[in-house]
């Protein structure tokens, strides 16, 4: 009897949420039809129960996104990517849910109407994956700008030490200094940790780092599949499709509860590991079959 009552209550709750979402509208804003953004949109569409209107900024004749949104007067705004969030964050009277953004804190702070899912993967998780793929690594190099990623680096250093790994971090304040700081790590490290620091990650620095990796047989852990395709050994990154689903769940809560102040900002709940087997072979690294089975392989 109690079990049947629980089922009835659950079904009634779902019916109320669906009814609440009926006739409501979500506006999705994205800068362009970029493949990961399209995946995120698919995930969102699969979960969100409201009507959905999409605005692609690059396809607008006039670049006044806010004016277009105000004409639609949606119940919730979905910002896919940093450019989209930058455009819509001035809107204060409509809830905004962001996704596909690495560091939302860089452009938002205490706005009560903005919540979302960041692409941040905790440093603990990244170090754990690194230690499983490369169990003999004891010294990991890192180059960072303290104004960009200083807090991340300090926390990562503490975690690495607790795992028996020494984090050797060189500080830079200009992109011009990044290559020489990487060069300074030669002979001192077993692997390099490439973090999403906008001061460090430039096309010139990435090219230098990839050459450094091959010349010194130093594997790179990075944050994006594209760098694994270019020559890094491994990346741990978010799943755009699942992030879209996560954002859709947030939007549903906002639309049904009518109180977006209680929908907290959070991190992506699922990641994907990419491994470049050609690079592993070139560096003389053998990776456990069990780890390979759970990763996406780039040959």
Residue ranges and their predicted role:
Residues 21-299:
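Short hydrophobic alpha-helices and adjacent helix-cap/hinge residues
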Residues 7-17:
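Bacterial N-terminal signal peptides
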């Amino acid at each position: 009897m109690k079990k049947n009552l629980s089922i009835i209550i659950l079904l009634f709750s779902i019916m109320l949420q669906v009814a609440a979402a009926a006739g409501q509208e979500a506006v999705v804003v994205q800068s362009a039809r970029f493949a990961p953004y399209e995946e995120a949109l698919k995930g969102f569409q699969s979960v969100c129960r409201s009507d959905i209107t999409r605005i692609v900024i690059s396809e607008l004749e006039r670049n006044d996104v806010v004016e277009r949104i105000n004409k639609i007067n949606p119940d919730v705004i979905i910002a896919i990517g940093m450019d989209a969030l930058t455009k819509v964050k001035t809107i204060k009277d409509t809830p905004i849910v962001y996704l596909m953004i690495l560091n939302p804190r860089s452009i938002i702070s205490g706005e009560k109407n903005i919540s979302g899912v960041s692409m941040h993967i905790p440093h603990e998780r990244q170090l754990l994956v690194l230690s499983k793929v490369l169990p003999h690594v004891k010294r990991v190099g890192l180059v960072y700008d303290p104004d960009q990623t200083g807090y991340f680096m300090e926390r990562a250093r503490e975690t690495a030490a607790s795992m028996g790994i020494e984090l050797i971090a060189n500080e830079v304040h200009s992109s011009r200094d990044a290559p020489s700081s990487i060069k300074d790590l030669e002979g001192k490290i077993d692997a390099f940790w490439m973090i999403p620091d906008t001061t460090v990650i430039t096309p010139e620095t990435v090219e230098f780092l990839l050459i450094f990796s091959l010349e010194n047989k130093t594997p790179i852990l990075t944050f994006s599949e594209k760098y694994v395709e270019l020559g890094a050994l491994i990346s741990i990154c978010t799943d755009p499709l699942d992030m879209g689903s996560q954002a859709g769940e947030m939007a549903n809560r906002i639309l049904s509860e009518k109180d977006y102040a209680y929908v907290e900002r959070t991190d992506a709940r699922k990641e994907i590991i990419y491994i470049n087997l050609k690079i592993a072979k070139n560096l003389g690294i053998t990776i456990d079959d069990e780890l390979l089975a759970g990763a996406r392989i780039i040959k």
